[in-house]
């Protein structure tokens, strides 16, 4: 194996190679893949030094900060520094200090450029840090994170304002955090392993993403990420039966429902549709929750959604000074006008209150091609002015139909991300991630909504590679530097000619299959009819949009499920005896194996961790389709999504099987992040442990306990774990792929549970027949409109665990003695549910000359977890929880070490150098020899520590 190290000095590019000492690498590394794909969304991936001489770029898959000298006018490689896992944002504080947020590591790397560039400090922050800015007098560092993560409640920062319990089960909690540090002294208190924030600020929206600073540096703007759009689901139990739209009914609690589901009551072939809930949207004009027919559903909604999206903070006092609502559904980036301070927010606005995919022939309407409008919202003088970037699109004309304008896509921009504004305040540049282009707008026309995309598109800048994610404007050189994620490169654009004049490709450890398949998730130019829609319109960076959609297709036909059904042998007898407990036929037809093309609302599921989860969709209906039928084949199920490119995304044709396989090769490789609620040592709290004991115990929580019936019909009673199977060796994290009948109008597939923690924030649900818990009553403002169950209508896990099928009984259900205590314990356990990766994955610490006492125990923890056995099918089976990597400056470069958990020492590649644990730690006693540790994914340690010949990823300067 060889390692290539590139050094730029005085404009001269030098290369050299060194041999890898194989035997030491093999003994120290865990089994597992050399690379794990996470698909983290870049936020601020490129930055320029204050003096304008150095360009910085994050190498997200490589875990590096890359630096380029701009002295010659073209970026020339200067050095690279290993940071954490999945770096997504970079900011230069001075010419000699750069900060990097590492999304998967829950950390911020402070990189010194003095002497040998290296990490001098690692700040430990909340879950998934995304953006970073500097503002205020004295200067402060502001970092966005989710309102969770192990460090948030670490005893070392217990005295920090805002730190502590994230209150995951408490209503009305702000869930967007900003960690504030003194960058000149990030350790304002002694005894912390990862810095001491001045405060943790929280804002009333869900997990944040972007930050921006006013021109005077005194105001910081904070934006939520997936902030919603004032939509929520009315549960099926609150909707009148029978699809009667004008006939109200009285509900069990004595309140009135305005009628039934808007229908149609059948598909185009006359097959009766299953009863389902419906999506309602708050009408700010008349202050009512309304459906598509304008009917009022206030009696069936128990929360309010203020939809505050962006917040202004005094950078000096850290007090919130303003908030802005209805900015967008998914907010990506922000920028301020350097002349007048106008704030610009790139975003998409979802139309999930419109039902159905397909041509819309039978129902008369469709959401095809009109999923989420690409926008920039202009905020000025307290007013929020959304501007649709693609207002030229006629959404009523579907691709392939008469009158459709096939040229419209050439004027469209998809998934707008980073923005930069000229120093005179007149021109805005926006990175269009799904369009391989940079949009260019006159700011006056943008504010006045007078721009015409058909003519303005002549000024758009095409960029090779695709996945345009970040921008740096270099007016002194007349250049724009553009990060393109698809090919992991930086492009140079001549602003005068609007032509690409140079490109620098960053080393990429991703498998070629990942690189080749990624565009199919995002590329709206190739894979949609109008150039705006893509799979990522809903699956944001391959994850969720935190919304529900009703994507049935009345123009499709009923199909048959091949998936085994828990209680499946019992269901026909219940149907025959009219004992299902339902007020309407199961699945619409009273056939447990029917997939009706109409299904009602379902929340967007993550595309991460699909590989071992069986058939896809909430019902598992992609188990059968275009390319075949299989109950458990995840790959085939993914291929069967091909028609959605036509019926939903809105392309004129669907991809070929070969194209879908390319897509599958990428998407099925993506794994979820480690659980941010579970303890870093993979232990459980007493409550979580009690919940696990019941979950994995023998007591049936659901079904009928009757030996005679079971002998005739097979298993009729199931424990939690027998439905939501946890078997890491098989890749099962809450599902083994079966369906289940649970006393609701449709048979659904049992879902995985790895990301339950990411769905909290909705509190407030009325009484419904399926749930034994009482009406929550009005809970007031909340940050999310969708929670649990397939349709998102159940606010909390605790309420779901009060479902009538889990009712306490003598032989099944929750224990009759203190059932709510056990339900609370199970809720806590599910929020900390096992995942493909151990909680320690990505965690870091930097040992310095002053923090050995505080940071030493964390180093020991990392070493212990690197020796701890772990099982994960996604990682190849039996592995250790992590590979522990360490970096330290030695001589004129940075040396990487890999921990050998058997010998207890650290191995360096060059010359088979070995250092004892104590010897490596002792190096940090010398300023400038700080030692940074990283818990890498099992199997990736040699690549990260020593480099990768396959991709020429070096580790040294």
Residue ranges and their predicted role:
Residues 33-66, 285, 289-292, 299-300, ...:
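Beta-strand-rich domains and repeat architectures in extracellular enzymes and scaffolds
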Residues 57-75, 79, 310:
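Beta-propeller domains
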Residues 74-95, 103, 129:
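Blade-loop segments of beta-propeller domains
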Residues 82-87, 125-130, 202-209, 326-332, ...:
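Short coil/turn segments at the loop-to-beta-strand junctions that recur within blades
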Residues 116-136, 144-150, 155-177, 190-213, ...:
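Asp-box/WD-like beta-propeller blade repeats and closely related beta-sheet repeat scaffolds
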Residues 118, 215, 221-228, 232, ...:
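Periplasmic c-type cytochrome electron-transfer domains
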Residues 144-172, 225-304, 345-373:
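Short, conserved, GDST-rich strand-edge loop motifs in beta-rich repeat architectures
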């Amino acid at each position: 194996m060889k390692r290539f190290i590139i050094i730029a000095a005085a404009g001269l590019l030098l290369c050299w190679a060194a041999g890898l000492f194989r035997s030491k690498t093999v003994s120290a590394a865990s089994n597992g893949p050399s690379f794990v794909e996470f698909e983290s969304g870049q936020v601020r991936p490129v930055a320029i030094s204050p003096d304008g001489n150095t360009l910085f770029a994050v190498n997200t898959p490589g875990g590096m900060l890359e630096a380029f000298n701009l002295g010659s006018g073209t970026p020339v490689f200067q050095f690279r520094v290993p940071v954490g896992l999945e770096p997504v944002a970079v900011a230069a504080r001075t010419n000699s200090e750069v900060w990097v947020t590492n999304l998967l590591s829950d950390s911020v790397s402070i990189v010194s450029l003095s002497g040998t560039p290296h990490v001098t400090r690692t700040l430990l922050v909340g879950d998934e840090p995304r953006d970073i800015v500097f503002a205020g007098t004295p200067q402060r560092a502001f970092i966005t994170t989710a309102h969770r993560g192990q460090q948030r409640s670490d005893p070392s920062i217990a005295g920090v304002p805002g730190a502590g319990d994230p209150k995951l089960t408490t209503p009305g909690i702000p869930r967007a955090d900003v960690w504030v540090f003194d960058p000149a002294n990030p350790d304002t208190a002694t005894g912390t392993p990862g810095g001491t924030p001045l405060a943790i600020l929280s804002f009333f929206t869900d997990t944040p993403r972007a930050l921006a600073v006013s021109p005077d540096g005194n105001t910081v703007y904070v934006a939520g990420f997936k902030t919603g759009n004032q939509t929520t689901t009315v549960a099926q139990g609150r909707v009148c039966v029978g699809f009667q739209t004008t006939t109200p009914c009285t509900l069990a609690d004595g309140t009135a429902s305005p009628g039934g589901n808007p229908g149609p009551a059948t598909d185009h072939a006359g097959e009766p549709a299953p009863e389902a809930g419906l999506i309602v949207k708050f009408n700010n004009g008349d202050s009512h929750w309304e459906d598509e027919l304008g009917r009022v559903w206030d009696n069936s909604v128990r929360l309010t959604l203020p939809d505050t999206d962006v917040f202004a903070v005094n950078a000096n006092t850290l007090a919130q000074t303003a908030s802005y609502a209805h900015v967008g559904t998914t907010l990506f980036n922000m920028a301020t006008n350097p002349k007048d301070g106008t704030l610009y927010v790139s975003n998409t606005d979802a139309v999930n209150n419109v039902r159905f995919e397909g041509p819309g022939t039978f129902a008369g309407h469709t959401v095809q091609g009109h999923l989420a409008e690409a926008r920039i919202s202009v905020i000025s003088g307290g007013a929020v002015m959304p501007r649709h970037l693609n207002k030229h699109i006629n959404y009523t004309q579907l691709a392939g139909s008469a009158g459709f304008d096939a040229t419209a896509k050439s004027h469209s921009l998809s998934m707008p991300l980073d923005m930069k504004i000229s120093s005179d305040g007149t021109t805005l540049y926006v990175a269009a991630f799904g369009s391989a282009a940079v949009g260019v707008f006159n700011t006056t026309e943008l504010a006045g909504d007078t721009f015409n995309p058909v003519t303005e598109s002549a000024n758009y800048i095409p960029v090779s590679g695709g996945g345009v994610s970040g921008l740096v404007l270099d007016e002194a050189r007349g250049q724009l530097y553009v990060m393109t994620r698809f090919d992991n490169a930086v492009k140079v654009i001549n602003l005068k000619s609007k032509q690409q004049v140079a490109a620098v490709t960053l080393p990429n450890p991703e498998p070629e299959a990942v690189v080749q398949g990624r565009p199919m998730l995002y590329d709206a130019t190739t894979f949609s009819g109008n150039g705006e829609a893509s799979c990522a319109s809903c699956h944001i960076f391959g994850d969720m949009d935190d919304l529900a959609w009703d994507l049935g297709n009345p123009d499709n036909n009923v199909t048959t499920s091949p998936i085994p059904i828990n209680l499946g042998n019992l269901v026909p007898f219940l149907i025959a005896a009219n004992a299902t407990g339902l007020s309407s036929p199961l699945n619409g037809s009273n056939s447990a194996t029917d997939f009706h093309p109409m299904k009602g609302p379902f929340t967007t599921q993550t595309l991460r961790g699909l590989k071992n989860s069986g058939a896809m969709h909430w019902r598992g209906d992609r188990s059968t389709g275009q390319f075949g039928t299989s109950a458990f084949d995840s790959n085939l199920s993914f291929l069967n999504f091909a028609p959605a490119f036509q019926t939903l995304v809105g392309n004129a044709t669907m991809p070929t099987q070969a194209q879908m396989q390319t897509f599958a090769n990428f998407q099925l490789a993506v794994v979820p992040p480690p659980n941010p609620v579970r303890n870093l040592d993979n232990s459980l709290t007493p409550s979580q442990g009690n919940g696990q004991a019941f979950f994995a115990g023998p007591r049936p929580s659901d079904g009928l306990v009757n030996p005679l019936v079971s002998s005739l019909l097979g298993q009729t009673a199931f424990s939690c774990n027998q439905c939501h199977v946890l078997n890491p060796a098989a890749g099962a994290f809450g599902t083994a792929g079966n369906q289940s009948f649970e006393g609701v109008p449709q048979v659904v597939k049992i879902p995985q549970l790895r990301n339950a923690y990411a769905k909290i924030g909705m509190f407030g649900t009325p009484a419904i027949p399926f749930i034994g818990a009482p009406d929550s009553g009005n809970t007031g403002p909340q940050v999310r409109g969708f929670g649990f169950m397939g349709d998102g209508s159940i606010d909390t896990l605790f309420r779901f665990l009060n479902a009538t099928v889990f009712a306490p009984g003598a032989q099944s259900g929750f224990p009759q003695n203190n059932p709510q205590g056990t339900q609370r314990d199970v809720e806590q356990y599910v929020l900390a549910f096992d995942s493909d990766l151990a909680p320690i994955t990505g965690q870091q610490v930097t040992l310095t000359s002053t923090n050995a006492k505080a940071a030493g125990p964390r180093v020991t923890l990392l070493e212990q977890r690197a020796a701890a056995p772990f099982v994960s099918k996604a990682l190849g089976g039996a592995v250790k929880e992590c590979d522990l990597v360490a970096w330290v400056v030695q001589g004129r470069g940075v040396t990487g070490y890999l921990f050998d958990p058997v010998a207890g020492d650290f191995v360096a590649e060059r010359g088979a150098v070995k250092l004892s644990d104590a010897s490596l730690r002792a190096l940090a006693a010398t300023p400038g020899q700080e030692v940074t540790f990283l818990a890498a994914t099992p199997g990736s340690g040699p690549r990260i520590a020593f480099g990768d010949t396959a991709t020429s990823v070096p580790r040294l300067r």
